[in-house]
């Protein structure tokens, strides 16, 4: 067997060859060999031990609770009557270390033991082992779990109320209204946000099942959620609203009666009158009853409540549809009455439909609430209900009942269930006889609560057949369930029975019932209920010599297969490295982006880079084996390098002459990228990465194109097109007019630029960027300094990746990831380090501004340290002089704060093309007015709120931006 690029070896030399060629895999092979050797040695040792007689393991271990602190363990198959054997019983408290002592029982005929002195209502793990005195190992059963009393999953207390009112300034302890065994773990949330013991607020603390307020404040009011869970059943969420009231205040606004916890014990402390009292701004006292929508039939009573408190007593004003004096237009105004914080409209008609807003205010503030009252003429028909379906659920699962009304009335729902389980199926047929007495009361007041409903039903009898189901516990991830849906969590056997849905309106009431049948799970779940406990299979060592031999052989075969697979994988990897594809395989919407070197100050990192950057030691250049690419490899003897045209800390760009790189036997002037002698591994990998990406990108007239490379038998060279006029920034600055004292002694030879020339430059850059965007490449450093101008005045986007000046600080800000071109970067790139094609559009706007100012410096008076605050406040660069409003409109669109609102490069190409088509070659610039923005730019920009600004179009706009655009064509 031979491996790629390794000397041919015999089988005995396989491991040496694999170690020399693939050192990173040697450790894994060594581990596999150790496992194989251990398996074989174990088989041999077991052959000797197998001759000894082992005890039989106890079978059918069960646990029976006899009281809260004691459990009886029973098993079968003792030690065959031998007197020299013994039994060991192990007992562990679940998840809490040792819970009971280990018991050693002499004699082999024992099949039962009572474990005492346990903690009540706690779960334990038990295991029984049998031993011979002359044998080194015993035989054991698996672990089982049991407790003295059956565990209870989290369940909501029956007497729970969802509204809690507490006094200001006192200490209060509010427990989670959940019963469970073992004691549940509780987590608290306020207004949907987690409250943790590590919060800086020392006024709030937590016990195992309660939240404690040292001194209750108004800011502590809100919606609290208690999440309780233990090892059994599903977690339960309980919501309640905490209202803080000032019992020392003489002013106490009239409101609805508040409910509270009647069964919870509260701990209070003295009120410290020396501390400053909090402001008593108005607040609503019963938000749960303030439902925003009130759909009612005509000829009914409308009751709108806005119960509130405050000091001083707040005033309340009612308005309808924004009109304060709405009562003068009411038919028979005596029907409308205000009682404190309640608005009552008797015998409502359709004209009473509207939005009623209560405005509650005092000197500290104003609050308001709006009711949407809809009065409709409807048929006088009580609710017509669809039959409910019976439900079968397994223990511990969730289920629900749905109550549907088919007519067009909006009824009031109430859910109930029967107490007890005796003959409950027959009670569904007898409910009509009992429920008819409620008809008259329901017609008078259809919005009865469920408790009020049963008070009338049983007329204060102590023994009740029905009980209410409060919907406060019916919470889901999406919010509260609808009133016509009853959802039951963590179903238990005691939940089995009939359930009733009662729906009523002003014309009567109807009901439907269904039966919940609770069954055992079809698949045995982990032990979490009362014993008999579930037996866990015994995890004993194999006692058969045949089994050990089989396991050893199987292990050896597995190791052999793994070694063979690794060898095949190594061979395939080497073949792929020897014959790489001409272009990288890019599938899916993968984005390529430009990388910025750590020490970069100029735009010197590779133009295009993959997402993961190579890192290695920064001492010397590693000897990389670069695969030969015949399509791009250029002979070194046909390349002559000349003077340096760009230089940085670790690399440089030189001018060169290549024979036959463009046409056969024709010498072409090229630019050659190379490394300096002090370059490190990172710079080497950057250069190779840029080379690979340029191969994949392809050619375009407005991109510095790759011509070839030299990667074999010497340092790597990247050969690209040469630009005669250098970068665009210096080219523009060279076209600026001379200073006054120079005009008399110098003769200007620079060609005069027109508006059309400048638009052509921007157009070509936009086409190049549109090409990159189509290839899913992100430049990240688009600026005039990174655009080259050829001898034919073509614009070519580039980046001489290894030419850098580490002392230059104007363009970049030092971060942990390197220096960044701060003044060219979009806000999302600065603040969130998010680089996309739309962030390149922002940079294009800065580049267009540079073009219109003939190489001006953006934000000349804004320090780099203030750029973050400058952009965050919405300020932008001002319009360059002699720039038309349509051009500045493009700038403003590129500088939109939201990336999604910026134009695409395809749209920019079309817009600039339209401007060029209507421009005149005679549109000369006033060269006296171009250059860097004046010093006052920053101060004037402070007064310009640019956020959301859209520059007005001049009357001479020559084009209209279409709503949709097709992709722009490219030259390959």
Swiss-Prot record:
According to the UniProt record, what class of enzyme is this?
A: transferase
Disulphide bond pairs: 176-226, 306-358, 403-501
The record places the active site at 781
Q: What does this protein do?
A: Receptor for basic fibroblast growth factor.
Domain (Fibronectin type-III) spans: 57-152
Name of the protein in its database record: Fibroblast growth factor receptor
Could you tell me which residue ranges are on the Extracellular side of the membrane? 44-547
Q: Which reaction does it catalyse?
A: L-tyrosyl-[protein] + ATP = O-phospho-L-tyrosyl-[protein] + ADP + H(+)
Instruction: Give the signal peptide as a residue range, or say none if absent.
Output: 1-43
Spell out which residues lie on the membrane's Cytoplasmic side: 569-972
Question: Which residues are listed as membrane-spanning?
Answer: 548-568
Entry's Gene Ontology cellular component terms? plasma membrane; receptor complex
Q: Name one GO biological process term.
A: positive regulation of cell population proliferation
Q: What is its main location?
A: membrane
Which sites bind ATP? Answer: 645-653, 673
Q: Name one Pfam family in it.
A: Ig_3
> In terms of domain of life, where is this protein from?
Eukaryota
Cell compartments where the protein resides = Membrane
Q: Give a GO molecular function annotation for the protein.
A: ATP binding
Per its UniProt record, what Gene3D superfamilies does this chain match?
Immunoglobulins, Phosphorylase Kinase, domain 1, Transferase(Phosphotransferase) domain 1
């Amino acid at each position: 067997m031979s491996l790629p690029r390794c000397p041919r070896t015999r089988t005995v030399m396989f491991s040496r060859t694999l170690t020399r060629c693939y050192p990173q895999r040697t450790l894994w092979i060594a581990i596999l060999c150790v496992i194989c050797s251990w398996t074989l040695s174990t088989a041999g040792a077991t052959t000797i031990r197998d001759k000894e007689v082992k005890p039989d393991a106890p079978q059918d271990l069960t646990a029976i609770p006899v009281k809260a602190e004691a459990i009886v363990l029973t098993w079968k198959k003792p030690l065959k009557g031998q007197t020299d054997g013994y039994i060991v019983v192990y007992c562990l408290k679940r998840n809490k270390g040792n819970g009971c002592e280990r018991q050693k029982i002499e004699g082999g005929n024992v099949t039962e033991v009572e474990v005492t002195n346990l903690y009540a209502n706690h779960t334990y793990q038990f295991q029984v082992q049998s031993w011979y005195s002359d044998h080194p190992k015993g035989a054991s059963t698996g672990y089982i779990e049991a407790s003295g009393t059956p565990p209870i999953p989290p369940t909501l207390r029956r007497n729970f109320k969802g509204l809690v009112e507490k006094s200001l300034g006192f200490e209060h302890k509010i427990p989670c209204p959940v019963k469970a065994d073992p004691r549940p773990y509780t987590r608290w949330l306020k207004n949907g946000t987690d409250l943790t013991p590590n919060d800086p607020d020392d006024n709030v603390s937590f016990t195992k099942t309660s939240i404690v307020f040292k001194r209750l404040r108004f800011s502590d009011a809100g919606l609290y959620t208690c999440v309780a869970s233990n090892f059994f059943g599903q977690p339960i969420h309980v919501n309640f609203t905490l209202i803080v009231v000032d019992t020392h205040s003489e002013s106490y606004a009239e409101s609805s009666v508040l409910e509270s916890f009647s069964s919870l014990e509260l701990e209070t402390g003295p009120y410290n009158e020396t501390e400053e009292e909090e402001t008593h701004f108005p607040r609503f006292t019963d938000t749960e009853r303030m439902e925003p929508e009130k759909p009612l039939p005509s000829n009914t009573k409308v009751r709108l409540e806005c119960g509130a408190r405050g000091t001083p007593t707040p005033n309340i004003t009612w308005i309808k549809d924004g009109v304060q004096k709405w009562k003068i237009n009411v038919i028979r105004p005596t029907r409308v009455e205000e009682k404190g914080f309640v608005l009552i409209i008797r015998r409502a008609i359709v004209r009473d439909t509207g939005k009623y807003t209560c405005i509650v205010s005092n000197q500290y503030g104003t609050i308001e609430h709006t009711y949407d009252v809809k009065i409709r003429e409807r048929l006088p028909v009580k609710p017509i209900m669809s039959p409910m379906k019976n439900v079968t659920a397994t223990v511990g699962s969730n289920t629900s009942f749905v109550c549907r009304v088919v007519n067009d009335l909006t009824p009031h729902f109430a859910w109930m269930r029967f107490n007890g389980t005796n003959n409950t199926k027959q009670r569904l047929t007898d409910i009509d006889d009992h429920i008819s007495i409620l008809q008259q009361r329901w017609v008078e007041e259809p919005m009865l609560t469920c408790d009020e409903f049963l008070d009338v039903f049983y007329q204060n009898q102590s023994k009740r057949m029905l009980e209410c189901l409060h919907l406060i516990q019916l919470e889901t991830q999406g919010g509260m369930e609808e009133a016509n849906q009853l959802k039951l969590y963590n179903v238990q056997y005691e939940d089995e029975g009939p359930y009733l849905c009662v729906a009523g309106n002003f014309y009567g009431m109807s009901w439907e019932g269904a039966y919940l049948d609770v069954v055992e799970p079809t698949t045995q779940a982990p032990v979490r209920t009362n014993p008999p406990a579930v037996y866990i299979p015994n995890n004993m060592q194999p006692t058969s010599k045949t089994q050990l031999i089989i396991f050893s052989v199987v292990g050896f075969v597995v190791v052999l297969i793994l070694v063979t697979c690794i060898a095949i994988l190594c061979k395939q990897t080497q073949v792929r490295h020897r014959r790489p594809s001409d272009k990288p395989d890019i599938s899916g919407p993968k984005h390529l982006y430009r990388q910025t070197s750590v020490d970069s100050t100029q735009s010197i990192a590779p133009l295009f880079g993959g997402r993961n950057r190579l890192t290695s030691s920064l001492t010397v250049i590693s000897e990389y084996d670069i695969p030969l690419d015949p399509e791009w490899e250029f002979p070194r003897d046909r390349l002559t390098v000349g003077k340096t045209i760009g230089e940085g800390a670790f690399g440089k760009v030189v001018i060169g002459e290549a024979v036959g790189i463009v046409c056969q036997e024709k010498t072409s002037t090229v630019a050659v990228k190379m490394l300096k002698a002090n370059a490190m591994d990172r710079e080497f990998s950057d250069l190779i990465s840029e080379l690979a990406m340029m191969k994949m990108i392809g050619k375009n007239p407005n991109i510095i194109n790759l011509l070839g490379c030299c990667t074999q038998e010497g340092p790597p060279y990247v050969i690209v097109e040469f630009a005669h006029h250098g970068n665009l920034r210096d080219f523009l600055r060279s076209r600026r007019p001379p200073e006054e004292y120079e005009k008399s002694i110098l003769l200007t030879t620079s060609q005069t630029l027109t508006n059309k020339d400048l638009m052509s430059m921007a157009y070509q850059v936009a086409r190049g960027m549109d090409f990159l965007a189509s290839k899913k490449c992100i430049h990240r450093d688009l600026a005039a300094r990174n655009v080259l101008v050829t001898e034919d005045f073509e614009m070519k986007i580039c980046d001489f990746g290894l030419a850098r000046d580490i002392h230059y600080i104007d363009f970049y800000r030092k971060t942990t990831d390197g220096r960044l071109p701060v003044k060219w970067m979009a806000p999302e790139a600065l603040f969130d380090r998010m680089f996309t094609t739309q962030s390149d559009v922002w940079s294009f706007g800065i580049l267009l501004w540079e073009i219109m100012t003939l190489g001006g410096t953006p934000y000349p008076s804004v320090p780099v340290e203030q750029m973050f605050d400058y952009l965050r406040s919405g300020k932008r660069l001002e319009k360059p002089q002699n720039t038309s409003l349509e051009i500045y409109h493009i700038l403003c669109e590129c500088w939109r704060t939201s990336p999604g609102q910026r134009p695409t490069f395809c749209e920019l190409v079309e817009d600039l093309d339209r401007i060029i088509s209507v421009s005149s070659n005679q549109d000369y610039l006033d060269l006296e007015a171009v250059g860097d923005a004046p010093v006052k730019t920053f101060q004037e920009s402070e007064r310009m709120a640019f956020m959301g600004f859209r520059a007005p179009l001049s009357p001479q706009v020559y084009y209209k931006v279409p709503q949709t655009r097709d992709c722009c064509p490219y030259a390959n």
